[in-house]
Amino acid sequence: MTLRNFFALFACLLVLGCDNEVSAPADTTESMAETATEPAAKPHYEPWGVDLGANNPDIQPGDDFWGYANGKWADENEIPPERTSHGVWLEIHERAEKRVRGIIEELGDADNETGSSEQKVGDYYASWMNVEKVDELGISPLQPDLDRIAAIENADDLAAEFGRQYFVYGSSPFSAGLGINPKNPDEYMINIGLTGLGLPDRDYYLDDTERFIEIRQEYLIHITQMLGFANYRDPVEYADSILALETAIAELQWIRADRRDRDKTYNPTTVTALKEQHSGFNWAAFLESHRLEFVENIITNHPDTIEPLIALVNEQPLDVWKAYLAYHLISGNGSILSTKIDDANFAFVGKVLRGQEEQLVRWKRGVARVGAQQGLGEALGQIYVDRYFPESSKTQMLELVENVRAAYKERIQGLSWMSEETREEALMKLAAFYPKIGYPNKWVDLSDITISEDDLFGNARRLREFFENRDVEKLKTGTDKEEWFMMPQTVNAYYLPNWNQIVFPAAILEAPFFDPNADPAVNYGAIGAVIGHEMGHGFDDQGSKYDARGVKRNWWTDADRANFSSRTDRLGEQFDTY
């Protein structure tokens, strides 16, 4: 969840609550008991939980409340050169980051049993920090993949390589991603769609304003550099061809608003129909190399792009596609290759695209890699919550969730513009929200993964293979609603419409967002806003398309949907004036 997304929270709360007042939430948060020998714990920010040193009393809150509350902090702090933003999120993130580093380095110094989670965590980090070994290998770990790409002889080979790219951090114009079936929350399905761009969005290719023109020029330099690391012949010429190819893909890509529309992107079909209707591409080779040869029922996300994308695949010279695959393979693996490649990759991806002045120091990047969801994040998460997340915080958070839910219920019950038919469904959905607090009830079994202290590339590749194969198995076994899609040490939260779940990892439940020893009003104003934000996603323009069970269906009357849209449109118009 980003700062920008708080506007969505305020919009949803205003629309759902503009007709009635909100009762103060019941104060059910119990303070910690005092004993004769142990005084009550104090809040992180004394005396009652808010950092009053951040405010600027020279600003009248009625004129500029943000400036009044945060003005002094804003004047005294700058965005760090290795970051693109700054604020309380970064403060909490760095607190968790230091804790995770301590855990990792402690495990690295210990005599751990081979194959244990502790050994894997310590050795994965050690392999990342062994820069001398990484530099010694240079680009050589990628050579088998580059040789395979160079050996592509025809369209069938190309289709197979497109499918294989998901296992090697490469790229493909066709995506085949795992997703929960919008009509059945108990099963997964494969989504076929358009992808394959090296720049963030179609506008980066098609917009001729000065900024985007400069980015495209820098992109050409970047592609040339990456191909040069592989001693590619004519890298400048191929860079031009790759940019032209991706521009053609960008012209087919839907605009962002359509890509996030759950109705437009839900187009169920079958592989049999896909092969019959779009026979110019070897779907069997593509799916088999992706280990999806057994799949029949699928969803196409952007159906009108499939045929023109196939035409593009077949019309472009094979050598251009091979150069495209080679470039994305090198760039996609840049962070686990030599310092020279890594730095060159950051110079474009970090500096040009993200506006990040400096690369994060290596230990921070290593902590992020080891602790990632598709790294050893759950192994780390178990230790993190044992050390830093007491069960009492989970209990207190559940009380907060229930009180925010109660306030939301009052809002919905008091809406004069909503029909009883829609209100009944809305209240059912609200009551069915399933909160997950802190950490999973069961953890991912990582015992089959081999991690070596001197093989960074191999470690990353084996982890990628493990999680891709795990996704394939999910298609056969169905969903597990106890699964988490964030790690406990992540400072964030999310709402999952398919399962109607709101999820709050342990690391976000820290002061100033959540403080078990602060005045209850502080927690309602801080983490309460995050709780309300995630609940709000269940009733926003896309989340409201799912019912209490997480099934995608329209439970709104036409009049209620029109009323909701008119109110959110007015808020959007107001926002546009700022």
Located regions from the model:
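Bacterial signal peptide processing site
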Residues: D19-E21
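C-terminal motif of bacterial Sec signal peptides marking the signal peptidase cleavage site
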Residues: L14-G17
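Active-site-surrounding "flap" and adjacent substrate/cofactor-binding loops of secreted or lumenal enzymes
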Residues: A41-H44, Q60-D64, Y68-K133
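Sec-dependent signal peptide recognition
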Residues: T2-L9
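Short, Gly/Pro- and small/polar-rich lid/capping loops
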Residues: A36-G53
